Amino acid sequence: LNEIKVFKQKFTINELTVYPELDLKKPHQLQSDIQLSTGGKISLKGELDESPLMINTQLKIENLALVPLSSYLKQVALLKLESGVVNVDGHLQFSQQAKNQASFQGNVGVSQFAANDIKLNQRFLAWQDLLAKGLKWQLEPMSINVKEVIANKPFTRLIIAPDRTINFENIVASESKTNTKNNKQTMPLNIDKVQVNDGSMLFADLSLT
């Protein structure tokens, strides 16, 4: 077993095997099994070529814990992650070119998710399961297409303050607002179908008092 540390998280590589091809025109076979100390497993099985770099592999992520990554969320939203795990099952491709090409096709899910408003220390967003089925992502040109999004038992809190501001406005981190203004590039997002099961919302309009 080999243990490495990346982004302050420890990874244990249970298996990392590259089967070299004698025919240099053919890519090598790749198989990898990575266990995360914070919870979760990443598996790869496919092809690898080193010059130029090319990866063509099946990607499977099982029960990847989100809480250890909460510091990255704060750069986007003023939320504290309380729980949540990610599961991914699909096909990943990358090829090194003048403009690098990358794509993913498969299913992505987040389960047992809960996040609190940092300022109020109240539950802001939660769900039992959120699954993106038939997700297609590509790097160049950047786009995301999803056949269906299924949300089971989602919850959110919507509060209108006395000054008529909405609590959603206060969640976005100032750094994220600045980056949004400076970044003119947009990413097309298309979702064919959304299904919500047993959702709930806490709503209050304090501007009426």
Residue ranges and their predicted role:
Residues 128, 169-176:
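Short amphipathic alpha-helical linker/capping segments at the junctions of internal repeats
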Residues 15, 41-43, 87-89, 129-134:
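Membrane-embedded beta-strand positions in outer-membrane beta-barrel channels/transporters
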Residues 61-92, 149:
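Extracellular/lumenal and peripheral-membrane lipid-interaction modules
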Residues 164-167:
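Acidic/polar low-complexity surface segments
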Residues 1, 57, 82, 91-107, ...:
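Flexible beta-edge/linker motif
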